[in-house]
Amino acid sequence: MMKVKKLIAAGCAMILALTGCGAKQETPASAAKESSAVSSAVVNDAKESSMISSSAVSDAEGSTTASSVVSSEQSAESEKIKLTIEGYDKDNFPRLDGSLANEPLLLRMISDLTDTDADTAEVYLADSFVNGGTSTSWGKLLYDNMDLIISYEPPQEVKEEYVEMFDRLEIDPLGRDGLVFIVNVNNPIESLTVDQIRDIYTGKITDWSEVGGEPGKIRAFQRNSTSGSQTLLNKLVMNGEKTMEPEKDMLVGTMGELIESVAGFDGSGSAIGFSVYYYAEKMKSDPNLKMIRIEDVAPSNATIEDGTYPLVNDFYMAIRASEKSDSPVRKLRDWMLSENGKELLEEEG
């Protein structure tokens, strides 16, 4: 009997070795878990695949967008109107001058006429444009063989000095700009009336509390009497009244200096100054400054163009009246006064 039991035990051991008999058996629950794990792995793989596909799509879309932007910019550049005048090229171009705020327009004209980039055009323009300002440009056209100027209205002193000479010029309004008033961003004042500004610059109003601001002395910057912007102040604001004599440190030589002075004046926000819109907005924009509304109208291209902004004035293009009808200078003047010229002005802002 014992032999039989030993034989059975030996046989069972052999079977276990060969078949795994007696090993842990898989239950329906564990099978389900393994199946679920496999399914989850498949789902995760699918999700990763989807994410990769989405990323690829996003990359493709981004690439397409970037390409579209570049293409749009290139298209816009190619669609710009081109100023070409027979007789002008990079070896023969006009001598141009004007007000500082008109320098970008003059550069564009030289760039087009010489078919060069802006940097090269700046070198060409430097031969005639010496940044002497509004009054200087009128004198240079009369006496210095300047071909053409684009400038703001000449100051009264210049008109009186050259009163008989202006008959020798052909002067045409070319565009419109606005006289704007700037204060430090820390100044709570948002709007002033023309009367209030006049009273500030005559010295009748001396404290910001008199115009709704916080108590503090008003420090009003001015420019010299022959500058274009001071001329606009006298014409558009002062109404025949004289501006007060500025303190020594309140009188600055250039528009750039005025803007820098107002922006940085002792950090108190008590300063006020003025400029023309194009220069203050496009050429010398400063995050420490803000333009205030006049009669509650903010200066902008639109409000200056339609005249709803109260302080607007033309700027001018002038040549000598003696220019022959077929001269390149006169052809340039005529082109700038045409519809093409208006389009170029709009492109330059």
Predicted segments with their positions:
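Bacterial N-terminal signal peptides that target proteins for export
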Residues: 1-11
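Disordered, low-complexity tails and leader-like regions
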Residues: 2-3, 37, 62, 116
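Small/flexible residues
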Residues: 7, 26-27
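Repetitive helical segments and hydrophobic/amphipathic motifs
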Residues: 14-15
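C-terminal motif of bacterial Sec signal peptides marking the signal peptidase cleavage site
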Residues: 18-20
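Bacterial signal peptide processing site
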Residues: 22-24
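Intrinsically disordered, low-complexity serine/threonine-rich repeat tracts
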Residues: 28-78
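Exported/periplasmic ABC-transporter solute-binding proteins
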Residues: 42, 66, 70, 74-160, ...
